[in-house]
């Protein structure tokens, strides 16, 4: 729900920038074929794209208000879920399975990635069912890096935070770069979910 509403917010202005100028054709990426004429008046409203409600929440076009409300409504559940998850990790000592204890995990993760990328299946009986270096590094990044950054960059987009603490968005350079970072984190989450579900399906739901 939080990702789908985020997609609806994104397509209302499907361009991402690294500065607050947001001038014509200075975006670093766009999700629309439409180009902006530099010699005529233009508003972001004209740039809004339609998206299927199957993908976006609520989907359609010019629904950014509902999308933002849906996005904000899911945030408390995202935070509570994260707090409970981390508490259980600490309480059960399972955090030791997620937190790397050596930089050796980086070359080890690369080796595992090459193993996956060449479609080589792990040797049984352990196979996929015990954490390898890439899994450990991925889960650590999702829980302890991506989740906090998603919340921090999201706060940098808040007008209330900006008016009260106008120094805060500058931690991410500016408002638009915070939006870009927020999108990149969402994209990383989507990739993680797709790969995670694909590997679970590949190895068998009952075994994993």
What are these regions (language model features)?
Residues 1-208:
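Membrane-embedded alpha-helical bundles that constitute the cytochrome b-like, heme-associated redox core
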């Amino acid at each position: 729900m939080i990702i789908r509403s985020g997609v609806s917010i994104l397509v209302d202005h499907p361009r991402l920038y690294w500065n607050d100028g947001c001038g014509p054709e200075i975006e670093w990426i766009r999700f629309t074929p439409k180009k902006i004429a530099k010699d005529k008046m233009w508003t972001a409203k004209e740039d809004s794209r339609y998206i299927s409600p199957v993908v976006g929440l609520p989907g359609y076009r010019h629904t950014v208000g509902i999308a933002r409300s849906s996005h904000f409504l899911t945030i408390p559940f995202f935070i509570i879920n994260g707090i409970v998850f981390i508490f259980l990790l600490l309480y059960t000592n399972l955090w030791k399975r997620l937190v790397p204890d050596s930089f050796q995990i980086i070359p080890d993760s690369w080796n595992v990635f090459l193993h996956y990328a060449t479609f080589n299946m792990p040797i049984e009986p352990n196979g996929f069912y015990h954490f390898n270096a890439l899994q450990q590094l991925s889960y650590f990044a999702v829980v302890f890096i991506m989740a906090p950054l998603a919340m921090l960059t999201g706060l940098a987009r808040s007008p209330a935070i900006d008016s009260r603490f106008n120094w805060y968005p500058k931690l991410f350079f500016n408002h638009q770069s915070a939006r870009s970072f927020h999108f990149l984190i969402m994209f990383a989450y989507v990739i993680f979910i797709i790969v995670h579900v694909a590997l679970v399906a590949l190895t068998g739901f009952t075994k994993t």
